[in-house]
Structures are given as C-alpha cells and as structure tokens.
C-alpha cells in the first residue's frame, strides 16, 4: 500500500512514479548500499522540493525521515528520504530485505514553511515545525488527525 500526499499538484502518474522510485530505492539500497541514478525530463519531478517519507509495516511505524528545505529536485529528495527513513532513522534498525514486500509507504511533499498563528491551525492540513535551540522536529499534518488529537493536544 502506498500514498503520496502533496501540497502541490502532481498527476496520478507522477505520484505513482514517485512511489515506485521510493520502493525501488529502498530495495536497491538494501541489497547494494547505493542509490541508482534516475533520469527524468518531467519538470514537476525536477523542481526542488521538501519531502518526508514514512514507512510502516502492519500499521506500525518503521521509519519517517525527510527534510523541510527544498534542497534537491523532487525525485532526488524522495530517494534521499527513502534511504534515510529505511536505514538511518535512529529509532529503528535498518529495513531488512524480507520486510520490503510488507512496507506501506507515504510520501509527503511539503509546501513552503510559513508562520501561522495557533488559532489558524487546521488539524489534518497544517504540520508543525518545532524548534528549541539547535534542535527541531516536524509533525506532519496527518499526525494530529491519525491520533484523533484536538488543537490543544496537537500544540502541547
């Protein structure tokens, strides 16, 4: 099962291609510890994007990593996040080859970060970037809705 959630408009074909690329990247990296080159002329996949990849197995989180700044073309950001979520999330051991068929993949393409007042936050639409000193963490929009949080719980 796979899903691409975007803040920008991507066609169904582009979303499918990103999910395919994400899974292929995980498979190849698991076997060969490398990221395959990817060639595309699709302008939507070449534009810089901030991306998070979430991996689950049987609904249990198995990895979630990405970046909030659009430093790479979308396709490469997906590849980087796929490898990081699958093999570098410090909360979990790396994905094993026998786990790959069970992976549920979500790709979140983030919109540019903007300040927002707390009373303007819409659960399921807005994520939160929380910073304290040099540390920061991101709550994707689905975190609050998946956990049935109200606004106060989300902000606590």
Which positions does each model-derived feature cover?
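Basic nucleic-acid-binding interfaces
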Residues: 1-156
């Amino acid at each position: 099962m796979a899903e691409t959630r975007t803040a920008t408009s991507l066609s169904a074909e582009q979303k499918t291609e990103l999910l395919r690329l994400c899974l292929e990247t995980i498979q190849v990296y698991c076997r060969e510890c490398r990221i395959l080159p990817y060639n595309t002329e699709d302008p939507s996949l070449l534009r810089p994007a901030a991306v998070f990849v979430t991996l689950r197995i049987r609904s249990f989180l198995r990895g979630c990593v990405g970046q909030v700044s659009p430093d790479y073309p979308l396709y490469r950001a997906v590849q980087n996040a796929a490898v990081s979520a699958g093999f570098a999330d410090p909360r979990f051991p790396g994905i094993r080859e026998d786990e790959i068929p069970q992976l549920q993949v979500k790709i979140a393409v983030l919109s540019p970060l903007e300040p927002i007042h707390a009373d303007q936050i819409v659960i399921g639409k807005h994520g939160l970037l929380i910073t304290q000193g040099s540390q920061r963490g991101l709550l994707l929009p689905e975190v609050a809705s998946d956990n049935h949080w109200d606004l106060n719980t989300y902000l606590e």
